[in-house]
């Protein structure tokens, strides 16, 4: 199983930017923790970070046929990007959205979420641990899809 982790604008500044909101853990440290959990679950991870909307859209599109699922922190683009929303919908892969802070306890503009309606699930407010929760969730969803496809194939074979 292969999962793409997509990090949006300013996520590369974790550990430096607004530590009181996002914590002291750097993006690279989050990725290392995810790699450890993935290796324990026989999952391969790829990581991508960009501050540019078009690059994120391109990366989502590249996921089609190459990965089993996506974990995305679209960061500020969560509230503004129809393009990222449409890319997620277009590839139709299991996708879990992550936000380190609880966006629903913050400024009103952060409570508008264009991404969530096209995602399998959303995890907010658990700090860096939210990435672990997202990883466990995407593994579960991908396993269910794999088992369903195997069952459907078996039924086709028995006809």
From Swiss-Prot:
Keywords annotated in UniProt: Amino-acid biosynthesis, Aromatic amino acid biosynthesis, Lyase
EC annotation from Swiss-Prot or TrEMBL: 4.2.1.10
Organism: Campylobacter jejuni subsp. doylei (strain ATCC BAA-1458 / RM4099 / 269.97)
Active site: 22, 99
Site (Transition state stabilizer) residue list: 17
Pathway info: Metabolic intermediate biosynthesis; chorismate biosynthesis; chorismate from D-erythrose 4-phosphate and phosphoenolpyruvate: step 3/7
Recorded GO MF terms: 3-dehydroquinate dehydratase activity
BP terms from Gene Ontology: amino acid biosynthetic process; aromatic amino acid family biosynthetic process; chorismate biosynthetic process; quinate catabolic process
Name of the protein in question: 3-dehydroquinate dehydratase
Similarity field: Belongs to the type-II 3-dehydroquinase family.
Function: Catalyzes a trans-dehydration via an enolate intermediate.
Subunit structure: Homododecamer.
